[in-house]
UniProtKB/Swiss-Prot annotation:
Keywords: DNA damage, DNA recombination, DNA repair, DNA-binding. CDD domains: KU_like (cd00789). One of its GO terms (biological process) is DNA recombination. Disulfide bonds: none annotated. Residues 10-193 form the Ku domain. It comes from the Bacteria. Disruption phenotype: Not essential for growth in the absence of DNA damage. 500-fold less efficient for NHEJ on blunt-ended or 5'overhang DSBs, 4-fold less efficient in repair of 3'-overhang DSBs. The fidelity of DNA repair depends on the form of the DSB; for blunt-ends fidelity is very low, and no longer entails nucleotide insertion, for 5'-overhangs remains 50% faithful but with very little nucleotide insertion, for 3'-overhangs repair is fully faithful. 1000-fold decrease in viability when exposed to ionizing radiation in late and stationary phase; not exacerbated by a double ligD-ku deletion. Residues 266-289 have a biased composition (Basic and acidic residues). Belongs to the prokaryotic Ku family. It comes from Mycolicibacterium smegmatis (strain ATCC 700084 / mc(2)155). GO terms for molecular function: double-stranded DNA binding. This is Non-homologous end joining protein Ku.
Length: 318
């Protein structure tokens, strides 16, 4: 496992350095979207609605829109200036009886590992929580969010491991507004007794290993059967198509280079390789938006090209 956060638990005058790890993982099968016609992969691009350009992730900022339609941009630098974001401390706010915490508030779970040469302070806090049957309510910052969390101890094969469960804030829990439940319903004693007997007949100790995700297991069997039944296929990555309508020189150059790489190593016309190389040089040297050059001008540039691919193309022609 790889830790996602480092900090220290602070309670009283004691600090417990810890590493934080995600405690759970998704076991669902992941599917790709493909075109039903030819099984080609479906790709999504982040396109700016103002200029129409495809935007790289590194060039994307966050913006907040107010109720009246006003927008303000919040950068990573802005967020880094917040005091809560800079904190690397898990602050213990209070200790509560374990039964008082409603499971509805639980969000995500994380393991805590000692992050020091000595684990004494870690073990001390873990044993204290276990023997007093208490949960620590803590406050810390994780992934650009201020978190309320529950710190508790869980026994893993005779190893006491401290865990943090992030909690939902009270205003994140919705009110179940079901008017039908406001009506009084009469339950007969015999009905209540019979229902209790059914519950007792089905009561047992909880053994999580007895339960399996039947749907995912059947889905894996289906996938394996198709793989073994000759239905598997592979789709080669297709080079980006040239967009004649774009005026973004850098984007055009990238597409031209992709086309040149796609042609190398196979049987291709050397003239096409040479033309692609000369077009790339023209795109780099011209600061204006790329335009189609007259045939004579393109031929003149090709004859003066000194790059290795151009020489190789000329040798093939001779």
């Amino acid at each position: 496992m790889r830790s996602i956060w480092k900090g220290s638990i602070a309670f009283g005058l004691v600090n417990v350095p810890v590493k934080v790890y995600s405690a759970t993982e998704d076991h669902d099968i992941k599917f790709h979207q493909v075109h039903a016609k030819d099984n080609g992969r479906i790709r999504y691009k982040r396109v700016c609605e103002v200029c129409g350009e495809v935007v790289e992730y590194r060039d994307i900022n966050k913006a907040f829109e107010s109720d009246d339609g006003q927008m303000v941009v919040i950068t990573d630098e802005d967020i880094a200036t917040l005091p809560e974001e800079r904190s690397r401390e898990i602050e213990v706010v209070e200790f509560i009886p374990a039964e008082q915490l409603d499971p509805l508030m639980y969000d995500k779970s994380y393991f805590l590992e000692p992050d020091s040469k000595s684990s004494k302070s870690y073990v001390l806090l873990a044993k204290t929580l276990a023997e007093t049957d208490r949960i620590a309510i803590v406050h810390f910052s994780l992934r650009n969010k201020s978190r309320l969390a529950a710190l508790r101890v869980k026994d893993f094969s005779k190893r006491d491991v401290m865990m943090i469960h992030t909690l939902l804030w009270p205003d994140e829990i919705r009110d179940p507004d079901f008017p039908i439940l406001d009506k009084e319903v009469q339950i007969k004693p015999a009905e209540l007794k019979m229902a209790g007997q059914v519950v007792e007949s089905m009561t047992d100790d909880f053994k999580p290993d007895l339960y399996h995700d039947d749907y995912q297991e059947q889905l894996r069997e289906l996938v394996q059967a198709k793989l073994e039944g000759g239905e598997a296929f592979s789709v080669e990555e297709q080079p980006a198509e040239l967009d004649e309508g774009t005026e973004d020189v850098s984007d055009l150059l990238a597409k031209l280079e992709a086309s040149v790489k796609a042609r190398k190593g196979g049987k291709s016309d050397s003239k096409d390789d040479s033309d692609s190389e000369s077009d790339s040089k023209e795109s780099k040297s011209d600061s204006k938006p790329a335009k189609k050059a007259p045939a004579k001008k393109a031929a003149a540039k090709k004859s003066t090209a000194k790059k290795a691919p151009a020489k190789k193309a000329a040798a093939k022609k001779s």
